[in-house]
């Protein structure tokens, strides 16, 4: 398990763009699980949508990419403090099954599919109360900064 202090060592993101609150499981080179508590106070709810707030799908993809980036860093035993970052390089096969609402806990899972020359491919899904809300394949790219 990784608490927020350790997550901050693996992700360069900060408020309001840090979208992983806790890592619950990580198996180096294989898979990772974590979650984001979706609060009504999230800045994106101000405009998406004022009378019917839902978490933007692109931010669900970003949250899964951040979780996948942690798995990538853990696997290669590097951190941003080593002068590298994991960028979201692409997504495919994204499907949104139902909206994510204020008060939901967005549980996320990512499995490593393949990697070559610093490009990593992950099979991801996000759930709320055990129900799948989003699936996607995510690509991250490790780059020196």
UniProtKB/Swiss-Prot annotation:
Enzyme class: lyase
Cytoplasm is among the record's keywords: yes
Catalytic reactions on record: a (3R)-hydroxyacyl-[ACP] = a (2E)-enoyl-[ACP] + H2O
One Pfam family cited in the UniProt record for this chain: FabA
GO CC aspect terms: cytoplasm; membrane
GO-annotated molecular function: (3R)-hydroxyacyl-[acyl-carrier-protein] dehydratase activity
Subcellular location, record wording: Cytoplasm
Record: active site: 48
Tagged with keyword Cytoplasm: yes
One BP term from GO: fatty acid biosynthetic process
Keywords assigned by UniProt, alphabetized: Cytoplasm, Lipid A biosynthesis, Lipid biosynthesis, Lipid metabolism, Lyase
EC number: 4.2.1.59
Family matches, as CDD domains: FabZ (cd01288)
Protein family membership: Belongs to the thioester dehydratase family. FabZ subfamily.
Role, per record: Involved in unsaturated fatty acids biosynthesis. Catalyzes the dehydration of short chain beta-hydroxyacyl-ACPs and long chain saturated and unsaturated beta-hydroxyacyl-ACPs.
Protein name: 3-hydroxyacyl-[acyl-carrier-protein] dehydratase FabZ
């Amino acid at each position: 398990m990784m608490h927020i202090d350790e997550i901050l060592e693996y992700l360069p993101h900060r408020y309001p763009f840090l979208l992983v609150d806790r890592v619950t499981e990580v198996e180096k080179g294989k898979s990772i699980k974590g979650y984001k508590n979706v609060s009504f106070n999230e800045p994106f709810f101000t405009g998406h949508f004022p009378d019917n707030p839902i978490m933007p799908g692109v931010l669900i993809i970003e949250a899964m990419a951040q979780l996948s980036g942690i798995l990538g860093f853990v696997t290669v035993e590097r951190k941003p403090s080593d002068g590298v970052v994991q960028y979201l390089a692409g997504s495919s096969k994204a499907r949104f099954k139902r909206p994510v609402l204020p008060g939901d806990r967005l549980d996320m899972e990512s499995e490593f599919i393949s990697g070559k020359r610093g490009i990593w491919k992950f099979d991801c899904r996000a759930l709320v109360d055990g129900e799948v809300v989003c699936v996607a394949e995510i690509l991250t790219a490790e780059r020196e900064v």
